[in-house]
Swiss-Prot record:
It is a single-pass membrane protein. This is Cytochrome b6-f complex subunit 7. It holds the Pfam family PetM. InterPro entries: PetM_cyt_b6/f_cplx_su7. It comes from Rippkaea orientalis (strain PCC 8801 / RF-1) (Cyanothece sp. (strain PCC 8801)). HAMAP family: Cytb6_f_PetM. The chain crosses the membrane at residues 11-29. It is found in: Cellular thylakoid membrane. Coiled coil: none annotated. One of its GO terms (biological process) is photosynthesis. GO terms for molecular function: electron transfer activity.
Amino acid sequence: MTAESMMFNGAVLLMVLVLVGLAWGFLLLKIQGGEAE
């Protein structure tokens, strides 16, 4: 594996983790907001 492919894989993995984190956080906020009301 070259350094370039490792950097590319790392960037893709980071993007996926960020998207999953945002979706998870949004879902938790939505659930908590629904319970509050």
